[in-house]
A protein has these predicted regions:
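Well-ordered secondary-structure scaffolds
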Residues: 187-188, 302
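Conserved nucleotide- and phosphate/pyrophosphate-binding catalytic cores
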Residues: 196-304
């Protein structure tokens, strides 16, 4: 299915998953009041891992959202007010619950990093975490490199450190040993892995998924009208349906692997389809399987 882009310590990580029930986390900053199509990879990833018997922790990044992730940005993000961030958390939490079973904390949890980040003592953090980060190395990270010409604020420079601290906190609190995220988060995620290994001398890992892009490298999830949201109040069911109807053939086949639980044999069978047949088959599978995981799927069925 090509669900993995990169991972740390591949052999160790495979053994780690095979030997035990693993606690994994995925962090999402509440910078909007709804997820969009680009977030489906992370939401489905958590659902898959939970289905495989592991525990997933969905982390709402209300604390890190106060800073703003510089990854992939050419300028500093607008600073959000605390009230807006809290309102976004409330809406996004409801959407997460459509993918992840949060009723049993042994299977899934939803936490907010503002609960621990806002309580931090700056000097204590510097002493605990600071010695384990090299500024020279941080400046070579992809998330910072592209900003060196246009300017990188000290505020944003701290984002990697706080995200790494999240992983450390979750490791100590819940024995969380794996972080997952999009491939554009690779540099930030490495910081947390290395921090835990240096402080606790134990295994911690991260793995990323490929970014959802078209064949020419453009991120999926946006149209000329803007983002394609999962909230039906922001993107109507018909508009959502039309977005998927217009997905190019190569991406339709890829999405079938990403967003369904179809066995590999069925996915391979779809490779024989050409042109519009790929998309028609994709939509038919949504009908047949009645995939209720996402607003995306259930509302597609309503329109169909």
């Amino acid at each position: 299915r090509n669900l993995i882009a990169q991972m740390t310590h591949p052999e160790e990580l495979e053994k780690h998953f095979n030997d035990q029930k693993v606690t994994i986390y995925h962090g999402m900053d509440p910078t909007a009041d709804s997820f969009h199509v680009g977030h489906l990879m992370g939401l489905m990833y958590m659902a898959r891992l939970q289905k495989a018997g592991h525990r997933v922790i969905a982390v709402m990044g209300a604390g890190t959202a106060m800073i703003g992730d510089p990854s992939g940005k050419t300028s500093m993000r607008p600073m959000l007010k605390r009230e807006q961030i809290d309102a976004n958390v409330k809406n996004l939490s409801k959407q997460i619950s459509k993918f992840v079973d949060l009723a049993n904390p042994e299977k899934g949890m939803l936490v907010n990093n503002a609960d621990w980040l806002l309580k931090l003592n700056y000097l204590e953090v510097l002493r605990e975490v600071g010695p384990h980060f090299s500024v020279n190395r941080m400046l070579t990270a992809d998330c910072f490199k592209s900003r060196m010409e246009s300017g990188l604020s000290f505020l944003e420079f701290n984002y990697m450190i706080l995200q790494s601290y999240d992983f450390l906190h979750l490791y100590k609190q819940y024995k969380c040993s794996v972080q997952i995220g999009g491939d554009d988060q690779w540099s930030n995620m490495l910081g947390g892995v290395e921090l835990i290994r240096r402080i606790h001398r134990t295994g911690s890992y991260c793995l990323t998924w490929p970014l959802l892009t078209t064949s020419d490298g453009k991120k999926m999830g946006k149209t000329e009208q803007g983002a394609v949201w999962l909230d039906p109040e922001k993107t109507s069911p018909y508009e959502y349906y039309q977005y998927w109807r217009n997905v190019e053939d190569a991406s339709a086949l890829k999405c079938l692997g990403y967003f369904t639980y179809l066995p590999q044999s069925e996915l391979d069978a779809h490779k024989k389809f050409k042109g519009q047949d790929v998309l028609n088959s994709f939509m038919e599978k949504l009908r047949q399987k009645k995939l209720k995981r996402a607003r995306a799927n259930s509302l597609l069925l309503e329109v169909l």
